[in-house]
Curated annotation (Swiss-Prot):
Residues 1-210 form the PV NS1-Nuc domain. GO terms for molecular function: ATP binding; DNA binding. ATP binds at residues 338-345. Its main location: host cell. This is Protein U94. It comes from the Viruses. It is found in: Host nucleus. Keywords: ATP-binding, DNA replication, DNA-binding, Host nucleus, Nucleotide-binding. The gene is U94. The lineage of its organism: Viruses, Duplodnaviria, Heunggongvirae, Peploviricota, Herviviricetes.
């Protein structure tokens, strides 16, 4: 329904934009005399768009949102035909409430069109809207269709660059700021691209990060520092440890930090501290089993998977919930054993999606692949392979003990304690020959054997399915004393 800007386009493009503002009626019949009842058929049975803040207090009503989408079509059709632009114009739009009156703000790329002609085009746009949208009835609203000028009273046409959106409009926080910019996802991608360009240039210059927290330009240092610390707390509370996750969650706060001096370094610093804070103060379970919506457990794919593999879902859920909560003592590992296609990897991947700090270890344990797993909340040991040389370290790791592994004479890495998921096609106890070693593994592992391949039409397990299942299991926990193998229902 909306055109988009190509995410690969340079954010600092030479494209310039004009800004049109269209005021809407508070009372349609009173402020647009002569409007027919048929006119409102355009607005019936229209689904609510999936935009941000649509249901917040003060958001534009659906009638105005629908009117905006139709007016945008009329304006762009005129613009692309009458101005003879070589390609369809790039644009951004936003509907909002200003002082109780609905409003539409539209940025349209000039694409070489002389600014001196904008007044003429705006007059013609008014006429086209009256004819093609308002069915020939002119709104009785002062200055209902205007374009931005350099002065409040008069002046030339004000021209904007695309950076005006994130660096000015998105910085405004007000109750009526609703229905954020229509191409917000693409804008986030473009902002991410600038960020990557900035980070290269700034790291080449090796800036002094202290300038960002304690600027010399008169900025309130204490206020800026407290805001930065508040941002770190917000990131860690939500489990945000990557730039992509930050942009998806709140592009506005990301851009606010990016626009500061050396903001890209600040972003990296905030994410780095957020990771350390999460690792020091949170458990994996803190990011799971928080559900505020109703659901039917029998339709949950995790519940269905355990039933398919002949496990008691309550027992399985109890084990997983308490294991993620560090409440099973030395039993720090769950193993999902089974052939390809049995659902073990799909289940594990969905668990990890909920947890911001996680690692995946492939195959055997060695010094080359340890450094990346020093600060994780959950470790997935995929296709686990146990060798005799490192068995004591493996035993400690599976048992939830902190281990310090030497990398070289001057360096080491600390791993754990963190819950571990081990997946394999064979029972991990078959990888060792000593009965002592088998006993050690039995004391540290809950073993789920998946012996059935899931059907092709089996639903894909999503991260929310894990949340629902563990939330359900948390309220039905049972006492369980299991040596190694989780029993199946006969």
């Amino acid at each position: 329904m909306f055109s988009i800007i190509n995410p690969s386009d340079d954010f600092w493009t030479k494209d310039k934009y004009i800004m049109l503002t269209i005021k809407g009626p508070v009372e349609w019949e009173a402020e647009i005399p002569g409007i027919s009842t048929d006119f409102f058929c355009k607005f019936s049975n229209v689904p609510v768009p999936h935009f941000r803040d649509m249901h917040s207090p003060g958001a534009p009503d659906i009638k105005w949102i629908t009117a905006c989408t139709k007016m945008i079509d009329v304006i762009l059709n005129y613009w692309n035909n009458k101005t003879a632009v070589p390609t369809p114009a790039k644009w951004y739009a936003q509907a909002e409430n200003k002082a109780g009156r609905p409003s539409l703000t539209l940025l349209i790329a000039l694409d070489g069109i002389p600014t001196a002609t904008i007044g003429k085009h705006t007059t013609e746009i008014r006429g086209v809207l009256i004819k093609d949208f308002f069915d020939g009835n002119a709104p009785k609203i002062d200055d209902w269709c205007t374009y931005a000028k350099t002065k409040k009273n008069g002046g030339g046409t004000q021209v904007f660059s695309l950076s005006y959106i994130p660096f000015a409009l998105l910085q405004i926080i007000r109750p009526q700021f609703q229905w954020a910019w229509t191409n917000i996802n693409e804008l986030g991608d473009v902002c991410d691209e600038i960020h990557r360009k900035h980070i290269i240039s700034h790291f080449n210059k090796k800036p002094n990060v202290k300038l960002m927290l304690f600027p010399k330009d008169g900025t309130n240092r204490i206020s800026l520092k407290s805001k930065f610390l508040g941002t770190i707390e917000w990131l860690s509370d939500l489990g945000i440890v990557t730039e992509d996750a930050w942009i998806r969650r709140d592009v506005r706060s990301y851009m606010q930090l990016l626009t500061l001096t050396h903001g890209d370094v600040l972003i990296h610093r905030a994410l780095s501290i957020s990771k350390k804070r999460i690792r020091a103060t949170r458990k994996a379970i803190d990011f799971i089993a928080h559900i505020d919506t109703d659901f039917e457990i029998y339709e949950n794919p995790v519940y269905q998977l355990f039933c398919l593999q002949s496990f008691d879902p309550i027992l399985a859920g109890t084990i997983l919930y308490q294991w993620l909560s560090h409440r099973r003592g030395k039993k720090n590992t769950v193993s999902f054993i089974g052939p390809p296609g049995c659902g073990k990897s799909m289940l594990t991947g969905a668990i990890l999606e909920n947890i911001p700090l996680h690692g995946i270890l492939h195959g055997s344990l060695n010094t080359k692949n340890l450094r990346a797993y020093g600060q994780v909340l959950v470790l997935w040991w995929k296709d686990i392979s146990i060798n005799f040389e490192n068995f004591n370290i493996i035993k400690s790791l599976l048992g939830g003990q902190k281990i310090i592994f030497p990398i070289n004479e001057n360096d080491h890495v600390q791993i754990g304690p963190c819950p571990i998921i081990a997946t394999s096609c064979v029972d991990i106890r078959s990888m060792v020959h000593s009965n002592i070693h088998k006993i050690n593994l039995s004391q540290r592992v809950y073993n789920f054997t998946f012996d059935k391949v899931i059907p092709r039409n089996f639903p894909v397990i999503q991260k929310d399915d894990i949340n629902q299942f563990l939330f359900w299991a948390r309220n039905r926990s049972i006492n369980c004393f299991i040596d190694y193998t989780v029993p199946k229902i006969l």
